[in-house]
């Protein structure tokens, strides 16, 4: 082990480095990632240049906590209900019930909502601001343009939707990104048209949150048949009829239609020309049941025309059906992809009266229980990360799909050599390799959860990273990071760690990173450089000097220490993590502390030295 030093000359305040320079923008399409299966998300070299006119929508649910907990309950305002003292059993997690008693799961009461699994963010309710913020961030990072709020059950959940829009507005005022908003209605139900009218009367006609409305063909888009509109609404909205299964009569010839889910190979909806695809759905799965009038049991492992019916055969975490549906969408190449969905998470328990033939892998007899839309890890269609099971696989598969569909801007290639003075922050002013992170994503959580869960608290947000920079002087990589407020003490646990992936190294790694800085923790003048011995097993190989000044931090890592063999041409991915990741669980970057960039993503620095033309 060796000690690597740099000399500290002087300290300069933050004002000197920012001195009028435009703030860097958060640009997720330039980030890279590696998921738990080793699948990579790359850059424009993998996906090609941007394809203008491609739009992504995501089916989005806001019913969590609005229909009671241990028992079904409906209130006139359809707001989230505060759990009562008698809510001692829910959430009913079907996957856990099956794991405990596969042949006789102990379901909750008839009519009660049951979860198919546990969200990574916990069993939440829909008005938890911390969750709303996390969802907006994850969806924006993925490239989702619009969430399509489910109002197909004749309920608009007005207090919850209003809370969501208020949070989105607040996030935007803070400089952060959110998707736009649209809604989907089932106007063929008895009160379906009235549901649409309520949303129009309460939000659209009043011009509320207009900056959040998603527009298509110049007008706010809602998913419902045009004939459901009054003349006033018809002049106001663009509409697309939206329901399940393009083989059903509602779809007609497909004009101005868009299924929220469909069987492979999916059909597309069109607007003026039947030969021009406008919209198409893509889903990880459809339903857990076969009905007397249709075969619809399609789980996450369905592919090549077959649903595996034993757990040994099922590959729920690989996204086989999801990939098949997306491949079909890329063949057709519509202007709008409708992904179903993000966060349904639960379904009501019903008793079979003879209409259902199978539930999941088993026969469903008269008098047996069944669940319409979701059941367990295999028979569910949410993309939001799961706790346990397949984790965040579907989220990063979504990110990959959207980049394939939209293309991405070319990532910048750097050629400048910079002489960095670690004591003079003004030397960073000319550095062009600048990477931004969301401001305010250390927001603390303190909100009641679902049913018996109690208060969900997360106060791990600490150092809010807002900007990173990287430079090299021909022998050393220099890393700079800036936080929103003064950086906390180095004695804090899991403090300001930097992870480095030298592309092409071939060395053992943790989540693709061969090296870590600050793992173990630093003292006030030195920090450890460690290398992975395979996974979260680190060996210290050197000490590095580093410097913290108020809300800025600089650390230097020599090429030789991390195996950069060609100083004129190399690529490095890197990631800052503060107060997250215990025992190697990188998914904690979705929920704890702060990571720059978010989740599993990492920044990429490409260096290609230009030839000296003076010689």
Task: Describe the predicted segments one by one.
Residues 423, 475-485, 552-559:
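Short, well-ordered beta-strand segments enriched in hydrophobic/aromatic residues
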Residues 9-20:
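Bacterial N-terminal signal peptides
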Residues 1-6:
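N-terminal secretory signal peptides that target proteins for export/translocation
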Residues 418-452, 506:
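Acidic, glycine-anchored loop motifs typical of Ca2+
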Residues 466-469, 541-546:
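Beta-strand-rich interaction surfaces with strong enrichment in secreted/lumenal proteins
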Residues 412-429, 499-522, 561-615:
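Acidic/polar low-complexity flexible segments
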Residues 490-497:
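Short coil-to-beta strand junction motifs in C2/discoidin
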Residues 25-418, 424, 432, 487, ...:
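Glycan-processing catalytic domains of CAZymes
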